[in-house]
């Protein structure tokens, strides 16, 4: 999952200006900054708040301060006005947050016993939503959002393919060296 993120997300963002990241092809469309931030918040919430029943990294590590957003903001159910009003994000900070979330996700997955795939952490509020369904959701939604980011880039820059999209000669570094892999 990380490899797909690193091989597609970072090149799709590479070299984009702040204005390009805020481009909306329609008044009711999301822009790249919102999509990337939303992806990180979704994964953080699912892995920490839902699966592990702990506070998110957003809360624990005060990423909201680093990104200049309210601590309770989760990126869900935004109105068009809220998407437009999202403060301009420093993409390096947003990606640092996403990488911290992804490293925490990988550590969680490293210790996840197979029996937990069928566990439903919150049967009252989310009956039938198991760890396995949550992980499937993260993969599908993440893939959809990666496609949206690449599409928004393509709308603005045309058929521009960063070298790393088509070549594995310069791979991204392995995530989370502390995992020992």
Stretch-by-stretch model annotation:
Residues 7, 11-14, 45, 100-107, ...:
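A generic structural signal for well-ordered alpha-helical segments enriched in polar/charged residues
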Residues 16, 112-115, 152:
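A short secondary-structure junction motif
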Residues 70-119, 133-141:
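Acidic/histidine-rich alpha-helical segments that form the ligand environment
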């Amino acid at each position: 999952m990380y490899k797909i993120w690193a091989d597609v997300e970072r090149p799709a963002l590479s070299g984009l200006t702040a204005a390009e990241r805020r481009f909306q092809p329609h008044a009711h469309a999301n822009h790249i900054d919102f999509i990337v931030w939303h992806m990180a918040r979704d994964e953080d919430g699912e892995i920490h708040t839902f699966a592990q029943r702990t506070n998110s990294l957003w809360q624990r590590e005060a990423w909201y301060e680093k990104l200049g957003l309210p601590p309770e903001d989760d990126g869900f159910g935004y109105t068009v006005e809220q998407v437009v009003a999202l403060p301009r994000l420093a993409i390096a900070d947003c990606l640092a947050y996403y990488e911290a979330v992804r490293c925490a996700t990988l550590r969680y997955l490293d210790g996840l016993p197979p029996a937990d795939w069928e566990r439903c952490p919150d049967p009252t509020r989310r009956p039938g939503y198991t760890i396995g369904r949550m992980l499937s959701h993260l993969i599908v939604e993440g893939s959809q959002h990666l496609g949206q980011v690449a599409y928004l880039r393509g709308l603005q820059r045309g058929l521009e393919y960063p070298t790393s999209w088509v070549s594995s000669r310069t791979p991204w570094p392995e995530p989370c060296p502390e995992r020992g892999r």
